[in-house]
């Protein structure tokens, strides 16, 4: 057989195989389609059965829910009907109670009307009786009603006026006694708790020398050294027969301190000539400035005062080198601060403000030789300049009466200032001036007409005058006290204040037999 024939046979076989394959595939596809149709019908039937079951179940649930809702609505309706019935019963009860009250009110109103009528009848009867009595009284006394009223009112007015005057006097006396007692207690406690160790200072200072030959070196050739030192410091150097000592005299303690430091440095150095003196004086001034600041800071530390301006601290330090009647002003200010704080504590007041004012009250004395005006006013202006509070400014200006005090602390500082100044040994006068002042006080008092005797007491701070009662009455005593005060103020010079006490005593003696 040729090749072509084989090829044809192969092709025929392939075609037959393809046809058989297609037939087999088609048959299997028809079988699968038939099975799928059967499965679909089965699933559809199951779904229909499930849907029918769920439908029935939903219908049952809906019926149950409907039954529950109907039962709930019926229950609520029953409760509402019960509530309405209860409210109706309450309303009926209230209506019945209101009816009873209304009936009772009507009965009371009727009873009140009857009583009102009786009262009106009684008032009418009383008016008739009153008119009869008034007419009868006018006939018997011979006075009209207005005259009788005026007479009675005048009698009552006199009695009330007298009783009021007696009561006022008793109250004033009791209040004064209580106030004096409390004031004495406060001042006594404050003085007991304040221990001051500083008394009067002098206006001279003694510088010790290693030998008397040093006096000649201090004087210098033709006195040039002593003149230079006196010119630069403004202090008098007194060189006398006192062995190994030179006296520095001056009323400005700062200058005196500068001179002391400079002179002591010159003595230690040994080189004493005008150029060296000038150098030492400059160093001494710087040392004093440093000392002034340290003293001011120490004063604030001792009193517990904080927040002061640095310039106020410096002015406080300068007060160490100021004296008033021999009393060191810085020590006096510290003492016043403590006293004011203690008195404030005794009175139940915060002592901080009182202590602050007490420390600063004499700050004006640090510059009063540079600025014109009373030191209290100067001090208040300085405090205002350095942003102290209005109460502090007022209290400083008022501590000598130059301003009207606006706080209790200002009054306390006035009292503390007087206590510190009046303390024995705080301020010094010469014995001769002291005796002359006492004699002059008694002389002024004895010159007045009607004076029986007078005594200067309390170290010259009080003059007690006994007058003749037959010559002077109470008004005359008041006038005499004022006149004596004016005469003392015009003729005498004295520290602090002087109390003028005029006493008029009348005695009446009778004997019972």
Swiss-Prot record:
The keyword Disulfide bond does not apply. Keywords: Cell membrane, Endonuclease, Hydrolase, Membrane, Nuclease, RNA-binding, Transmembrane, Transmembrane helix. This is Ribonuclease Y. Residues 203-288 form the KH domain. GO terms for cellular component: plasma membrane. It holds the Pfam family KH_1. One of its GO terms (molecular function) is RNA binding. Belongs to the RNase Y family. Gene3D superfamilies: Hypothetical protein af1432, K Homology domain, type 1. Its EC number is 3.1.-.-. Residues 329-422 form the HD domain. Its main location: membrane. The chain crosses the membrane at residues 6-26. It is found in: Cell membrane. Endoribonuclease that initiates mRNA decay. The gene is rny. GO terms for biological process: mRNA catabolic process.
